[in-house]
Swiss-Prot record:
Protein name, UniProt field: Ribosomal large subunit pseudouridine synthase E
CDD domains in the cross-refs: PseudoU_synth_RluE
Catalysed conversion reaction: uridine(2457) in 23S rRNA = pseudouridine(2457) in 23S rRNA
PANTHER family documented for this protein: PSEUDOURIDINE SYNTHASE FAMILY PROTEIN-RELATED, RNA-BINDING S4 DOMAIN-CONTAINING PROTEIN
Classification lineage: Bacteria, Pseudomonadati, Pseudomonadota, Gammaproteobacteria, Vibrionales
Regions annotated as coiled coil: none
Alphabetical list of InterPro entries matching this protein: PsdUridine_s_RsuA/RluB/E/F_cat, PsdUridine_synth_cat_dom_sf, PsdUridine_synth_RsuA/RluA, PsdUridine_synth_RsuA/RluB/E/F, PsdUridine_synth_RsuA/RluB_CS, RsuA_PseudoU_synthase, TruA/RsuA/RluB/E/F_N
Organism: Vibrio vulnificus (strain CMCP6)
Amino acid sequence: MSFRSSSTSPRSNKQTATKRFKQSGQAQSVGSPKRHSVKRKNNEQSKKSLSLAERKIIIFNKPYDTLSQFTDGEGRKTLADFIPVKEVYAAGRLDRDSEGLMVLTNDGILQAKLTQPKSKSPKTYWVQVEGAPTEAQLEPLRRGVELKDGLTLPAQVEIIQDPQLWERNPPVRFRAAIPTTWLAITIIEGRNRQVRRMTAHIGFPTLRLVRYSMGGMTLQDLQPGEWKEISLPS
């Protein structure tokens, strides 16, 4: 990817390559059994009848301060401000104050594969934290940390060089006397604000969070607000 630099990580002596992070339970509705059965049958039929020609997969670089949904009653930026394609839905969410890769599709099977916990689909985030954690301080994340909603599964965590990202608008607020560090964190869960809570748990608050990859798909060279339609093998 070709990006403009916004800040420099003090851990530039770490030579870990970010390339290694290119990753090559259904809810039951409440109601009458008959209606549930018909709905389930229709959903299964629509999935089976979706051909490769009909399948749409879109990758999108979500800008900061954008909601990961198509509608909003409060006038905030949404996916509809950037993506004109109809009948595609986000596979998972990305916080309003986070940036990076979102996958949108009309393929229910792919959507489930990317989002359901049992699929254990990897998601990699580039995370700028306040401070300079040591390998020993990062080790709890690799083992799992106890958050309010339970113990996290082990994560892959590495210190990386500044990934040379685009400038964020608004800029990240830094404290001049405190260094920052970039981490690549890969998880196979999708709890609310999980990565931010994980880094805060070990004493290094997240300043900036960018999702780089999801289920083997990456940001490629997309700039904030850009999207493209891609195809995947059947």
